[in-house]
Curated annotation (Swiss-Prot):
Pathway in which this enzyme or protein is active: Pyrimidine metabolism; CTP biosynthesis via de novo pathway; UDP from UMP (UMPK route): step 1/1
Protein name: Uridylate kinase
Keyword Transferase among record annotations: yes
Catalytic activity: UMP + ATP = UDP + ADP
Xref: PANTHER family: URIDYLATE KINASE, URIDYLATE KINASE PUMPKIN, CHLOROPLASTIC
Binding site for UMP: G54, D74, T135, G136, S137, P138, F139, F140, T141, T142
Cleaved signal peptide residues: none
């Protein structure tokens, strides 16, 4: 087994990545596969933090456009990430991986409230820490939460799992000839207006020198390849 190039990672999983072909909810087979891939990393000695989106269950911004108060919609979206976190924690436990679910806001009896020093302690003990509830504030995406938690826990990289193989010069779904980038600078992304993540999240990562790696979690084994330094996905630094 190859040696990992990262000691501690923050893995950002979108809610859509959990829904499979169903188009809504959680596909148990995908959840179990992700848990096993994370287990591989723990066996390699990598410390893993996870941030989950909630778009498979609820999208606050979409309902805000339909007239719902944006703050209410975002609060509902935050709760959706907790539901995904509970499912991921359960899948990890079934795979015999120690995992702790933390929320950005209090949910007594369901999960722990986010505590920075406790999270660091658990990561050092090789327990997977799942950060749910976004940043705890409305108007911030779960990409912002991923970059924030990644910076806080001093991760070596934020790994953004998507449905495509990395960052392209245009939408590969619309243009089969789209060019995949292996490496980019933060300036490249802004100048070319490439869609990596929302600007607030991206500039947070840039300002703190946090590398971002975008890859396709749908490819079995891709997570291991990313962590062992193989040319998988796009690295932005």
């Amino acid at each position: 087994m190859s040696n990992p190039i990262y000691k501690r990672i923050l893995l950002k999983l979108s809610g859509e990545a959990l829904q499979g072909a169903e188009g809504f909810g959680i596909d148990p087979s995908i959840l179990d596969r992700m848990a096993l891939e994370i287990k591989e990393l723990i066996a390699m000695g990598v410390e893993v933090g996870v941030v989950l989106g909630g778009g498979n269950l609820f999208r606050g911004a979409k309902l805000a456009k339909a007239g719902m108060n944006r703050v209410v919609g975002d609060h509902m979206g935050m709760l959706a990430t907790v539901m995904n976190g509970l499912a991921m924690r359960d899948a990890l436990h079934r795979a015999d991986v120690n995992a702790k679910l933390m929320s950005a806001f209090q949910l007594n009896g369901i999960c722990d409230t986010y505590n920075w020093s406790e999270a660091i302690k658990m990561l050092r003990e090789k327990r997977v820490v799942i950060f749910s509830g976004g940043t705890g504030s409305p108007f911030f995406t779960t990409d912002s939460a991923a970059c924030l938690r990644g910076i806080e826990i001093e991760a070596d990289v934020v790994l953004k799992a998507t449905k495509v193989d990395g960052v392209y010069n245009c939408d590969p779904a619309k243009n089969p000839g789209a060019e995949l980038f292996n490496t980019l600078t933060y300036a490249d992304v802004i100048e070319r207006e490439l869609k990596v993540m929302d600007l607030a999240a991206f500039t947070l990562a840039r300002d703190h020198g946090m590398p971002i790696r975008v890859f396709n979690m749908g490819k079995p084994g891709a997570l291991r390849e990313v962590v062992t330094g193989l040319t998988e996905g796009t690295i932005i630094s």
